[in-house]
Curated annotation (Swiss-Prot):
<keyword id="KW-0175">Coiled coil</keyword>
<dbReference type="GO" id="GO:0042025">
    <property type="term" value="C:host cell nucleus"/>
</dbReference>
<comment type="subunit">
    <text>Homododecamerizes. Interacts with terminase subunits TRM1 and TRM3.</text>
</comment>
<comment type="similarity">
    <text>Belongs to the herpesviridae portal protein family.</text>
</comment>
<dbReference type="Pfam" id="PF01763">
    <property type="entry name" value="Herpes_UL6"/>
</dbReference>
<keyword id="KW-1048">Host nucleus</keyword>
<keyword id="KW-0946">Virion</keyword>
<comment type="function">
    <text>Forms a portal in the viral capsid through which viral DNA is translocated during DNA packaging. Assembles as a dodecamer at a single fivefold axe of the T=16 icosahedric capsid. Binds to the molecular motor that translocates the viral DNA, termed terminase.</text>
</comment>
<dbReference type="GO" id="GO:0044423">
    <property type="term" value="C:virion component"/>
</dbReference>
<protein>
    <recommendedName>
        <fullName>Portal protein</fullName>
    </recommendedName>
</protein>
<dbReference type="InterPro" id="IPR002660">
    <property type="entry name" value="Herpes_Portal"/>
</dbReference>
<dbReference type="GO" id="GO:0051276">
    <property type="term" value="P:chromosome organization"/>
</dbReference>
<keyword id="KW-0231">Viral genome packaging</keyword>
<keyword id="KW-1188">Viral release from host cell</keyword>
Amino acid sequence: MCSIAVHPTIQSVNLFEILQGKYAYVKGQTLYSSVRNSGTFFRQVFTNIYRDALSSCTYEDVLQDWIKYETSIRQRWKPSEKEDNAFKWSTFQSWFSTMKMTIDGIITKAITYIINTKCIASYERYIDWVATCGVVPVLNQRPNSKVVQMFKKHLEKEYSSVASSKSLTTIFHFLVESASSVLERLTSKFIPSYLEVSVTYDQYKCEYKASYQNKEIGVEVIIPPTIGSGKVVFNSPVQRLAENVMACHRTMEHAKICQLLNTGPLKAIVCSSSATVYKDILNHLDECGKKNDPKKELMQLLIKLAENKTVNGVTDVVEDFITDVSNKLVDRSKLFGDVNAEHPSDNLKKQVSNNVFKCLTQQINQQFETISKLEEERAFFLKKINQIETQLSKCQEEPQGTGGKPYNILTSSTLDALDGLSQSGLHLTSNQVTKGQSIVNSFFSQYVPPFRELQNDLHELWEHEIMQSFNLSPIIDNQGQRLFVRYTQDTIFFLLGPFTHNILGFVDMELLIEAYCTLSFYDIAEYLYSASRLAIYIVDIGQKYCSQPNLSDGSQS
C-alpha cells in the first residue's frame, strides 16, 4: 500500500465523538468551548480593518473637513471675543467626537455582518481538526459573489451619513473594498466536517491528501501525526485524553448495567420438584391405558415408595399394594382344602422383595434418566425458540431496508435498555436447576461500581490538558474562582497564525495582540483610534486652531 488511511478510521472518528460529548462528558471539557470560540479571530479581523481604514485618509482631507465644519458653526453662532477660545474648543471637540462615533458605527456594523454570514470558513471546525487529528482539510472554491454584493448593499445604506465629509468618504470607500475582500476570501475557503471528508497519507510523496465529494482537496498540517509501519498515531490533545475518557465511560456503562440488572421486576431461581415429576408420570400412565396392568401397578408402587421418606410410610404403601393385589388372587388352599399350603400374600411378599422389585427398580431408574435428559433438551430448545421468536418479532416491527436501532444504555429508557440487554447475552430469565446441580455463585447483591472519582479525575485532566496544550490564560476573580480563559500570545501564534496566513491566505494581516483578546469592539476601537494616523492629524489641527480653555478663567468672567 502506498497510502495510509488517516481519516475516517475507528481511532479518528472516536476522537471527534469525544469532542461532541458522546463519551463521559465532564465539566472540564467545557473549557474546550473557549478554545474553539471564533470571537478572537473576528477581533483580529476588526483590528486590521479598523487600523487600515483610519490610515487611508490624508491630512488635507481632514483639514478641509474641519474648515468646512468650523465655518458652518460660526455662521450659526457668533461668539464674542471673550468666548472665542471656549467656542473654538467646544466646536473642535464636537467635530472629532462625532467623526469617531460615525467611524466606529460603520466599521462595527460591517464586522457584525461578516460574523453573521453563515457560508464563511468555520473557525470552530478548524479547531476541532487541530485538537483531534492535527491536520485540516481545506477546500478552495469560488467566492460567494451573492454574499459580497449583499454586503456592499448593506453598507451603502450608511453612505448618506458620511457623504458630507471628504475624509469619512475616503474611509468609507476603503472599508467597503477592504471588508469585501476579506469576505471574498472567507467565502472562498471551506473546512468540511469529519463526516464529509477522507484523509490519506502518501508514503512515497510524503504528503497528505484529502477527498471531498469525489474531489481532491488540500490538507494543512498543524500538528504532524506519527506515521510508521502502516499505522497513524495522532499527537493531538484529545488523543492523549482518549484512553482516560473511554475508561471513565466504560465504568459508567458498567454501573448502568448493574443498576438495570438490579432493577428487574422479578428474579427467581426455580428448582424442579420431584412430586410434580411423579404426578406427570402417573397422569401419563393413566392416559396410556385404563386397564389394570401389572407393570403400571408396580410402577405406582415404586413411585409411592419414592415419595415417602419415613419407615411407617413405606410400610403402609407396601401393605396397601399387597392387600390390593391379594384381593385379585385365587386362594387355592381354600378352594382345594390344602391346609399346609402357604397363603398367596406370603408368596407375593417374597416375590416383591426379591426379583421383581430389583428388576423394576433398574428399569425405572433408566426411565428417569431418560426423562431428565429429555427435559434438559426441551429447556434448551425452548430457549432457542424464544430467542428466534424475539428476533422475528423485531424484524417484523422494523421497516424493510432499515438496520437495527442502536440504543444507549446510559440514556435510553429503562425498559428499552433492559430489552436490549436481554439480547446481548445478559439474559434476565429464570432457569431451572436440574437434579445433581447446585448454585455455587449468585448475583443478588446491589453492587454498582463507583465512577464519581473517575469523573473528577477526568475533569481535572481535561482542564490541565487544554490549558497546557493551547497555552491559555485563566481570568480569576477576587475569590480565586476562574471566570473564563483567554488566548495568550502563544495561543495566537499556534492557532490563529496558521488559520490566518496558511489557510485563509491573509499574508498581510497582523495577528491580534493578547491585550485585545477579551475586549469588545468598541474598547478595541478606543485603543486603535488613539494611535491612528487620523488621531494624529486631528490632534495637530486642534493644537494649531485652539487650546483647551482654562475653566477657572472662564468661571471668573
